[in-house]
């Protein structure tokens, strides 16, 4: 039977041991690493004292607390019994028999009065009778308890009495002051000061009249605290605390062997590719400020740090705004988080001269209340437990802060919005693709930080309310959103993941970073307008190519005017190709490719306008000043046609660097840059105005010339010629582009369609007016057709009537070809 039962019992024992080991392993994973000495963990955030020790609170939630030994001998109602005394030890106690007594069992000690069997070990010939058995303790103090018990035997009446010393310290017959320690001696007693105490001035140390007072080891220099700690006196002793904001490195907390280190401040280094003198001065100023930091002037340091940031943001940032913002916000939050540890508990607010607002709240980590942090621009409500997280500070406090700067928009105002999480639902709602979105900041950018640095997923939501520009009505394709700035690979973008906004303007988020209220304008793609644009541009490119070939190959029409027409068509042709191929910014990020496309479009379209202006100048010299010279030379025309737009692009780059080129939606000019709109609209408006004036003068002069050439011309034919000429000049001189200056409302569908049709078909209009309506061009086309088909070429006799011939000859001098 033993052979059968033993294996089963062995298996059960093994399983039980493994189960216990697994439980201990699971518990160890959830244990707090910071539990103080003489305590054990009960969770990953709390500890309890071991038996025999106690703390101020039942649960220990930060390492600043400690477990002190319980002196069981002083507990009310405690007694070891007759002929015994209590001896306290660290975490426990024992009861031992008085001198001359021993336990019947022969043991050295016991713990309960019920176990007391103390009996006299010396045979005196009499039966000892207990008399005046007293157990007393020392006066209040931090020294271990000392207890002395005296037993006086009383002989029978017939026996001689043997006198024994009376322990006045135990019997209560002493008159020592409560601040002293009673020491019994043969025939008397002394009253002396304990360790950490001293006689008051004028008092002796020993007599009954001795009165003691606590020794302030901290002020007297008798302490052994490390110079990295601060000595704090206690009754009869002292403790060594870390300086505010400093962290312990080794040793027991608040003990003489505690050593602390200064909190590390972030290194405000420049970006490797940044060469801004403003950034360099800012970095040096902040490094010097933090290097010379004095905890006594923490308020001054915080104010100077905020003012330095304001000074940096007031100057326009040339390049790498998102990279600078990522580094600036990270270092600023870390610095403020560290500086806040030196502040006293409670609220702290500061408003700089540039209206940058900082609000800090410093409270105990074990506070469970819902706390509000606010200033003039922002209001935040959060469960205070999330401020510390798993990070425990030595001083037992944590911080929550909000920083709002109106100038932060200069760095993050052009940051794109990430639509990946919501694109499908938005496209389903609008029924069309949404290639991009435009943003407008309605509130200040608010940077929120806590002592807890792991804020990607909080245990409870944080509620915000921002003071932002009120919106009476939200236009179509617009949405009011609560977004946060997310750093990514040195740059960043706006996102809404984890945040929601209700109708009352409150924003709820389960993570923390920098927040703002944005107005998002979704660019919903119009399939019909996109089709018109692509088909129109393809047709325009074909016609512009035919114009270029015609002006190069048809010899009879080559002149100064056809040279202007040639360069005009070349600029429009190149601009249309670049626009068709690269204008859409599918990725949403403004990179080098998008900026180069925007720059080339800027140059090509400005060059087209300049050649349109030269067309007007040619008409002016041709019609108005026909007898006063031949006009501009070829090199002068090229200098104006290509030099002026190149100069405008160069000036634009010098003013805004590359930031003005490229947009999250299209690779075109970013008109949100202050004044950058006029780098294109200014020259366009000026050229259109000048060409319109030239157009009026030209028509007026042509009317007079037609009357002088043929006074008897019929009014109908005269009106027809003037109408054709007017239409040609209107199209060539770019009035279709001028129509776009009046397209103030981008959501006006019919205006968008008209503008798109006029500009996409401009190549077709130019080909019809400059080539097909020109008789010499038609004759050349007919010759080429006959050469291809092998037919014999004949003159167009049907169109050479008398009036038509005279009209053709009259216009030939002007090379109009019509």
From Swiss-Prot:
Q: Where is this region: Disordered?
A: 799-818
The residues forming the signal peptide are 1-23
Give the record's GO biological process terms: cell adhesion; cell surface receptor signaling pathway; positive regulation of synapse assembly
Residue ranges that the UniProt entry lists as topological domain Extracellular: 24-533, 584-602, 659-679, 745-752
Q: Which Pfam families match?
A: 7tm_2 (PF00002), EGF_CA (PF07645), GPS (PF01825)
The recorded induction information for this protein reads:
Up-regulated during lymphocyte activation.
Q: Quote the Gene3D superfamilies the UniProt record gives.
A: 2.60.220.50, Laminin, Rhodopsin 7-helix transmembrane proteins
Which residues are annotated with the PTM Phosphoserine?
A: 425, 798, 814, 816
Tissue specificity field: Although predominantly expressed by cells of the immune system, expressed ubiquitously with particularly high levels of expression in the lung and the thymus gland. In the spleen, expression is detected on most myeloid cells and variable portions of T-cells, B-cells and NK cells. In the bone marrow, expressed in nearly all myeloid cells, whereas little if any expression is found on erythroid cells.
Q: Keywords for this entry?
A: Calcium, Cell adhesion, Cell membrane, Disulfide bond, EGF-like domain, G-protein coupled receptor, Glycoprotein, Membrane, Phosphoprotein, Receptor, Repeat, Secreted, Signal, Transducer, Transmembrane, Transmembrane helix
- Describe the location of the EGF-like domain by residue ranges: 27-68, 69-119, 165-213, 214-261
Q: What is this protein called?
A: Adhesion G protein-coupled receptor E5
> Gene symbol?
Adgre5
């Amino acid at each position: 039977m033993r052979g059968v039962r033993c294996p089963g019992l062995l298996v059960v024992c093994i399983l039980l041991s493994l189960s216990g080991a697994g439980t201990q392993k699971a518990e160890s994973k959830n244990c707090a690493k910071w539990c103080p000495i003489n305590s054990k963990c009960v969770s990953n955030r709390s500890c309890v004292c071991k038996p025999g020790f106690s703390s101020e609170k039942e649960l220990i939630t930060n390492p600043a607390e400690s477990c002190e030994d319980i002196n069981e001998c002083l507990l009310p109602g405690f007694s070891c019994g007759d002929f015994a005394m209590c001896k306290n030890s660290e975490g426990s106690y024992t009861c031992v028999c008085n001198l001359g007594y021993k336990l019947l069992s022969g043991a050295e000690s016991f713990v309960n009065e019920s176990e007391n069997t103390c009996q006299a070990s010396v045979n005196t010939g009499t039966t000892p009778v207990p008399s005046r058995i007293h157990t007393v303790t020392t006066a209040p103090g931090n020294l271990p308890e000392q207890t002395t018990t005296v037993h006086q035997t009383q002989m029978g009446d017939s026996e001689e009495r043997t006198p024994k010393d009376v322990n006045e310290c135990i019997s209560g017959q002493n008159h020592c002051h409560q601040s002293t320690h009673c020491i019994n001696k043969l025939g008397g007693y002394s009253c002396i000061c304990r360790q950490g105490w001293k006689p008051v001035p004028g008092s002796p140390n020993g007599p009954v009249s001795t009165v003691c007072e606590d020794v302030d080891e901290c002020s007297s220099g008798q302490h052994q605290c490390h110079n990295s700690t601060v000595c704090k006196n206690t009754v009869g002793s002292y403790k060594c605390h870390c300086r505010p904001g400093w962290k312990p490195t080794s040793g027991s907390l608040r003990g003489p062997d505690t050593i602390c280190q200064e909190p590390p401040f972030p290194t405000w280094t420049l970006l490797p590719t940044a060469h801004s003198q403003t950034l360099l001065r800012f970095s040096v100023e902040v490094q010097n400020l933090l290097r010379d930091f004095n905890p006594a002037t923490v308020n001054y340091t915080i104010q100077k740090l905020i003012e330095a940031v304001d000074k940096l943001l007031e100057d326009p940032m040339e390049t790498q705004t998102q990279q600078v913002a990522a580094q600036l916000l990270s270092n600023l939050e870390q610095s403020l988080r560290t500086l806040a540890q030196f502040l006293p508990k409670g609220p702290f607010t500061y408003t700089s001269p540039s209206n940058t607002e900082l609000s800090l709240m410093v409270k105990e980590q074990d506070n469970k209340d819902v706390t509000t942090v606010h200033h003039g621009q922002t209001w935040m409500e959060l469960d205070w437990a999330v401020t510390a997280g798993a990070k425990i500070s030595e001083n037992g406090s944590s911080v929550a802060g909000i920083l709002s700067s109106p100038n932060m928009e200069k760095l993050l105002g052009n940051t794109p919005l990430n639509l990946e999480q919501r694109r499908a639902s938005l496209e389903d709602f609008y029924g069309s693709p949404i290639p991009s979105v435009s943003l407008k900041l309605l509130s200040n950018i608010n940077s929120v930080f806590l002592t807890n640095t792991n804020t990607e997923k909080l245990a409870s939501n944080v509620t915000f309310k921002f003071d932002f520009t009120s919106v009476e009505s939200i236009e179509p394709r617009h949405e009011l959103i609560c977004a946060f700035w997310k750093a990514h690979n040195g740059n960043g973008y706006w996102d809404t993941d984890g945040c929601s906004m209700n109708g009352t303007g409150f924003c709820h988020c389960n993570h923390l970073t920098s927040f703002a209220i944005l107005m998002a304008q979704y660019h919903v793609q119009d399939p019909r307008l996109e089709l018109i644009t692509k088909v129109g541009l393809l047709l325009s490119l074909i016609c512009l190519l035919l114009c270029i070939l015609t002006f190069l190959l048809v010899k009879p029409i080559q002149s100064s005017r056809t040279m202007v027409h040639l360069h005009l068509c070349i600029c429009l042709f190149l601009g249309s190709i670049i626009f068709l191929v690269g204008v859409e910014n599918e990725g949403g990020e403004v990179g080098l490719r998008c900026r180069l496309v925007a720059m080339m479009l800027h140059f090509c379209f400005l060059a087209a306008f300049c050649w349109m202006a030269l067309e007007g100048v040619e008409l002016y010299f041709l019609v108005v000043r026909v007898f006063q010279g031949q006009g501009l030379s070829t090199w002068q025309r090229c200098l104006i046609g290509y030099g002026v737009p190149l100069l405008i692009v160069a000036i634009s780059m010098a003013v805004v660097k590359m930031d003005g080129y490229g947009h999250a939606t299209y690779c075109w000019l970013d008109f949100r840059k202050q004044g950058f709109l006029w780098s294109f609209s200014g020259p366009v408006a000026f050229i259109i105005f000048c060409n319109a004036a030239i157009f009026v003068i030209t028509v007026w002069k042509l009317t007079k010339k037609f009357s002088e050439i043929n006074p008897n011309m019929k009014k109908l034919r005269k009106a027809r010629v003037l109408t054709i000429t007017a239409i040609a000049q209107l199209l060539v001189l770019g009035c279709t582009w001028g129509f776009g200056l009046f397209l103030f409302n981008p959501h006006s569908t019919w205006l968008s369609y008209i503008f798109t049709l006029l500009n996409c078909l401009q190549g077709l209009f130019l080909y019809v007016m400059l080539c097909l309506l020109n008789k010499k061009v038609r004759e050349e086309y007919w010759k080429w057709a006959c050469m291809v088909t092998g037919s014999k070429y004949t003159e167009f006799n049907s169109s050479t009537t008398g009036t038509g011939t005279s009209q053709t000859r009259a216009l030939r001098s002007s090379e109009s070809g019509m």
